[in-house]
């Protein structure tokens, strides 16, 4: 099984030294991601493409899914490589592969060629296309918008019949740009802004300001872990949790109501700047969009940035909410975001849209900054890969079982792609498919007289979701530790 990885076009127009560095980094990223699932994978870089080979045909669907999420890949081709001697050899091998595909359909042949041959690409297209047209009586050549396009790459003495073309997410390989720290709240905006910086080649770390207790933290961890695992699993990243409840209490007690929103954001930026400095991170990322809420006017954003000791990036600054939600749906964070309450907007009833610097500074003079310093000093730093281990401790009150009884219902909370790749089949057992990101909105609709056993491949999401549901008041949940 072989894939040809085509690079993001912006990589190809870089200088030779930069392009080589980007391709080297992308090759390493692909290897890091795929080797976790298939130890037979070989990744080889070439001048303008990367070659991926695997001996495990059964992993095809999984590898296609994984490659489609790695930043830096524009698209990739699933190919079958064969040797040839003459142009007629190419025709015969193509015929055996595509004859059934072009029956009763229109088709055309497209050839790309490298190396020295006694025929041109156009000669090959005409010869192979004419042969297919004669050999398959019900097929008809049509050069414009055919039903089937037969694509063949010829390089020296080998032909590659392109079986399928898959789209990548584009962008730059992770590690080609500096690290950033994303202020993630669990909502639509912060998840999408994190993804956009990942796609642009930055390793994204996460900073979470806890305003809503354990339930809030669990939901945000779910989102951060999902984004990391899906799009940036090639790299280690940090998850930083800062308890901001006392900071909010101080603001509510001492700051004028209309100024609270801007003051809170300034406190968050101050804290995030300290975290960024500690780890040598170059920039802070937020999900703010111009005019979306009262604190996101140009005047207020300028005042917020004044206290930043790091560059503040706002990739969504010109995006509409509709665009942001559509992107959240595309990357798989929409349902998590839907279940997340908006804490920041709840602390001020009459927020100012045009804050005055002197007024903000006057209000902040009443604030006890030792509360902010204490919150930063007591921040929790976690390797995002350790979320599973930490969750084990946090969900100790949730039963983990290895043997199922007849009256227990399994909730398979894996994504639809994972379920398709490895269906869970247990004889005599009732299994309900409900992706983890739909639990918060759909679990209450289930028959609550039954006990539900949550299952996922590695146990991370099932434990997080079990704790989340317990926090919501559902006691009828357990975790499937191992299939028996």
UniProtKB/Swiss-Prot annotation:
HAMAP family in UniProt: ThiI
Domain Rhodanese positions: 404-484
SMART domains: THUMP
Ranges annotated as spanning the membrane: none
Domain THUMP, chain residue ranges per copy: 61-165
Gene3D superfamilies recorded: 3.30.2130.30, HUPs, Rhodanese-like domain
Identification of the protein by name: tRNA sulfurtransferase
NCBIfam families noted in UniProt: ThiI_C_thiazole, tRNA uracil 4-sulfurtransferase ThiI
Positions annotated as active site in the UniProt record: 456
EC number(s) reported in the record: 2.8.1.4
Listed GO CC annotations: cytosol
InterPro entries: Rhodanese-like_dom (IPR001763), Rhodanese-like_dom_sf (IPR036873), Rossmann-like_a/b/a_fold (IPR014729), ThiI_AANH (IPR020536), ThiI_fer (IPR054173), ThiI_N (IPR049961), THII_Thiazole_biosynth_dom (IPR026340), THUMP_dom (IPR004114)
List of residues binding ATP: 183-184, 265, 287, 296
Subcellular location: Cytoplasm
Catalytic activity: [ThiI sulfur-carrier protein]-S-sulfanyl-L-cysteine + a uridine in tRNA + 2 reduced [2Fe-2S]-[ferredoxin] + ATP + H(+) = [ThiI sulfur-carrier protein]-L-cysteine + a 4-thiouridine in tRNA + 2 oxidized [2Fe-2S]-[ferredoxin] + AMP + diphosphate; [ThiS sulfur-carrier protein]-C-terminal Gly-Gly-AMP + S-sulfanyl-L-cysteinyl-[cysteine desulfurase] + AH2 = [ThiS sulfur-carrier protein]-C-terminal-Gly-aminoethanethioate + L-cysteinyl-[cysteine desulfurase] + A + AMP + 2 H(+)
Gene Ontology biological-process entries: thiamine biosynthetic process; thiamine diphosphate biosynthetic process; thiazole biosynthetic process; tRNA 4-thiouridine biosynthesis
Keyword field: ATP-binding, Cytoplasm, Disulfide bond, Nucleotide-binding, Redox-active center, RNA-binding, Thiamine biosynthesis, Transferase, tRNA-binding
């Amino acid at each position: 099984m072989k894939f040809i990885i085509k690079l993001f076009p912006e990589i190809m127009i870089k200088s030779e030294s930069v392009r080589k560095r980007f391709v080297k980094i992308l090759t390493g990223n692909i290897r890091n991601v795929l080797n976790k699932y298939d130890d037979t994978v070989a990744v080889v870089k070439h001048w303008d493409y990367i070659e991926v080979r695997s001996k495990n045909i059964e992993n095809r669907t999984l590898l296609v899914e994984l490659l489609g999420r790695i930043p830096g890949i524009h698209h990739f081709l699933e190919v079958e490589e064969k040797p040839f001697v003459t142009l007629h050899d190419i025709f015969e091998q193509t015929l055996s592969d595509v004859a059934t595909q072009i029956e009763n359909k229109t088709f055309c042949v497209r050839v790309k060629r490298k190396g020295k041959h006694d025929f041109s690409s156009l000669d090959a297209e005409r010869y192979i296309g004419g042969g297919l047209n004669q050999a398959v009586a019900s097929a008809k050549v049509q050069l414009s918008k055919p039903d089937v396009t037969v694509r063949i790459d010829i390089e020296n003495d080998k032909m590659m019949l392109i079986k399928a073309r898959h789209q990548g997410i584009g962008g730059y390989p992770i590690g080609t740009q500096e690290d950033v720290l994303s202020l993630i709240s669990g909502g639509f905006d912060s998840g999408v802004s994190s993804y956009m910086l990942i796609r642009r080649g930055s390793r994204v770390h996460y900073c979470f300001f806890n305003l809503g207790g354990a339930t809030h933290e669990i939901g945000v961890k779910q989102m951060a872990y999902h984004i990391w695992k899906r799009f940036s699993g090639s790299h280690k990243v940090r998850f930083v949790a800062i308890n901001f409840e006392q900071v909010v209490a101080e603001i509510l007690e001492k700051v004028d109501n209309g100024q609270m929103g801007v003051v809170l954001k300034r406190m968050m930026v101050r804290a995030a700047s300290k975290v960024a400095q500690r780890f040598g991170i170059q920039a802070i990322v937020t999900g703010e969009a111009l005019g979306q809420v009262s604190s996101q006017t140009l005047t207020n954003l300028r005042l917020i940035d004044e206290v930043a000791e790091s560059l503040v990036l706002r990739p969504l600054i010109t995006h509409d909410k509709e665009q942001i939600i559509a992107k959240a749906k595309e990357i798989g964070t929409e349902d998590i975001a839907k279940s997340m309450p908006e804490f920041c907007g709840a602390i001020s009833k009459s927020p100012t849209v045009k804050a005055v610097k002197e007024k903000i500074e006057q209000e902040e003079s009443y604030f006890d900054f030792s509360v902010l310093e204490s919150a930063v000093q007591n921040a929790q730093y976690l390797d995002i890969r350790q979320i599973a281990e930490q969750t084990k401790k946090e969900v100790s009150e949730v039963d983990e079982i290895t043997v199922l009884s007849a009256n227990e219902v399994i909730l398979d909370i894996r994504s639809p792609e994972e379920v398709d790749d490895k269906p869970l089949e247990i004889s005599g057992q009732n299994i309900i498919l409900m992706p983890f990101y739909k639990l918060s909105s759909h679990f209450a609709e289930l028959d609550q007289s039954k006990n539900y056993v949550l299952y996922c491949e590695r146990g991370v999401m099932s434990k997080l979701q079990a704790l989340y549901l317990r926090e919501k008041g559902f006691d009828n949940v357990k975790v499937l530790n191992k299939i028996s």
